[in-house]
Curated annotation (Swiss-Prot):
It comes from Capsella bursa-pastoris. It comes from the Eukaryota. It is found in: Plastid, Chloroplast thylakoid membrane. HAMAP family: ATP_synth_alpha_bact. Produces ATP from ADP in the presence of a proton gradient across the membrane. The alpha chain is a regulatory subunit. The gene is atpA. Its main location: plastid. This is ATP synthase subunit alpha, chloroplastic.
Length: 507
């Protein structure tokens, strides 16, 4: 029989008494009443905040969006297949936030900032709220530095400045993503951090963008935030805010950032789905009443910060998809009114082989002209005017057979100018190359060439000037002005190359 030793028992009791913790923790809990379609109705959670994170028994996280008199509507950040009626939920006391650090550069992450590229964890010591207030009026300064996209049509006629919000709008399959990715490629060596947010895209499309950026060495300064079409609506709704939080981290550290939201139509659809399932009253096109606020609070976070805050910037290029060119639909009109201009991509131009398919007539940049360099202003004014006159004449010429010589010349010039605006995908041009290209067109040097020869000649001209007249690029780069000296170098180079080209073509 085991002998019971009183001293051992008293020691154990003494230890237990010493270890006793008198701390009382109060946990705000609730019970699941109903769950399905990514929404859970919770009874209890009396002191929960709007937007607070809640945790279910089996580990799923949700956001409390609807605070009603007898229950709380929670949207789930996962499939929630293991959540059952009656299971318990606890409030975490936290609002959604993500870790942020330099280590995110070159990575592909989801809306919760978890890596999805299979390259291991990302170390981060700081965190930021996903929903942060936008900088106030005093914290900002007006846009004055250019953000070059590398596309002639945009940089000359619809210029974008650092800190601007410029909408890219058009039907499906008109090259909206291509314009955005070309802009990322053109930031190489410009000390700009890029964030590409893919919302509700096909996983294959996102993989294609990532591969294209990797091949050209652009992932070194880029972060990709992706929530594909099969992701829960909650995560598709959160993805743009996650991207904005990452871009803000760099902006407040005196760096320049570019963020692309591809696309906000899908985010609005995800938000509509959540709102209707939460039984919020539908408005126009069944979107909830606060869908304008959904986008305005996101896009207002893009800014050019004042000198006191370090002059960092966040430039936003939101993308919106239209249905058969209808710009007057609800989401397009909302985003047009929030942004500082729009680049309109036309399906007709795209099908006619004009790519990028930018409709220059109805595209505008409301603040970008202040950011254009002087040399570009000097050549772009004439280009814009001649293209506008050409568009008018072309419509008129369809109905008239006998045109006078001056009109024929103007039409011929317009066709060549339209040709010089065409660019291959992933082939951005430097601002000096753009200036020499536009100057060649607006000063009539292309008028003697066949339309089919224009692009071939321009490619050779850019190579020739780079090799034989490097002084031109040096003057533009240092003075940002098309000086008389630079113009004479340019004229000489164009004349020499034109003579060589015409001789080649004759052979």
């Amino acid at each position: 029989m085991v002998t019971i030793r009183a001293d051992e028992i008293s020691n154990i009791i003494r230890e237990r008494i010493e270890q006793y913790n008198r701390e009382v923790t109060i946990v705000n809990t609730g019970t699941v009443l109903q769950v399905g379609d990514g929404i859970a109705r919770i009874y209890g959670l009396d002191e929960v905040m709007a937007g607070e994170l809640v945790e279910f028994d089996e580990g799923t996280i949700g956001i409390a969006l609807n605070l009603e008199s007898n229950n709380v509507g929670v949207v789930l950040m996962g499939d929630g297949l293991m959540i059952q009626e009656g299971s318990s939920v606890k409030a975490t006391g936290k609002i959604a936030q993500i870790p942020v650090s330099e280590a995110y550069l070159g990575r592909v992450i989801n809306a919760l900032a978890n890596p999805i590229d299979g390259r291991g964890k990302i170390s981060a010591s700081e965190s930021r709220l996903i929903e942060s207030p936008a900088p106030g009026i005093i914290s900002r300064r007006s846009v004055y530095e250019p953000l070059q996209t590398g596309l002639i049509a945009i940089d000359s006629m619809i210029p974008i400045g650092r800190g601007q919000r410029e909408l890219i709008i058009g039907d499906r399959q008109t090259g909206k993503t291509a314009v955005a990715t070309d802009t990322i490629l053109n930031q190489q060596g410009q000390n700009v951090i890029c964030v590409y947010v893919a919302i509700g895209q096909k996983a294959s499309s996102v993989a294609q963008v990532v591969t294209s950026l990797q091949e050209r060495g652009a992932m070194e300064y880029t972060i990709v935030v992706a929530e594909t079409a099969d992701a829960p609506a909650t995560l598709q709704y959160l993805a743009p805010y996650t991207g904005a939080a990452l871009a803000e981290y760099f902006m407040y550290r005196e760096q320049h950032t570019l963020i692309i939201y591809d696309d906000l139509s899908k985010q609005a659809q995800a938000y509509r789905q959540m709102s209707l399932l939460l039984r919020r009253p539908p408005g126009r096109e069944a979107y909830p009443g606060d869908v304008f606020y959904l986008h305005s609070r996101l896009l207002e976070r893009a800014a050019k910060l004042s000198s006191q805050l370090g002059e960092g910037s966040m430039t936003a290029l939101p993308i919106v998809e239209t249905q058969s060119g209808d710009v007057s639909a609800y989401i397009p009109t909302n985003v047009i009114s929030i942004t500082d201009g729009q680049i309109f991509l036309s399906a007709d131009l795209f099908n006619a082989g004009i790519r990028p398919a930018i409709n220059v007539g109805i595209s505008v940049s409301r603040v970008g002209s202040a950011a254009q360099i002087k040399a570009m202003k000097q050549v772009a004014g004439k280009l814009k005017l001649e293209l506008a006159q050409f568009a008018e004449l072309e419509a008129f010429a369809q109905f008239s057979s006998d045109l006078d010589k001056a009109t024929q010349n103007q039409l011929a010039r317009g066709q060549r100018l339209r040709e010089l605006l065409k660019q291959s995908q992933s082939a951005p041009l430097t601002v000096e190359e753009q200036i020499m290209t536009i100057y060649t067109g607006t000063n009539g040097y292309l008028d003697g060439l066949e339309i089919g020869q224009v692009r071939k000649f321009l490619v050779q001209l850019r190579t020739y000037l780079k090799t034989n007249k490097p002084q031109f690029q040096e003057i533009i780069a240092s003075t940002k002005t098309l000086t008389a000296e630079a113009e004479s170098f340019l004229k000489e180079g164009i004349q020499e190359q034109l003579e060589r080209f015409l001789l080649q073509e004759k052979v």
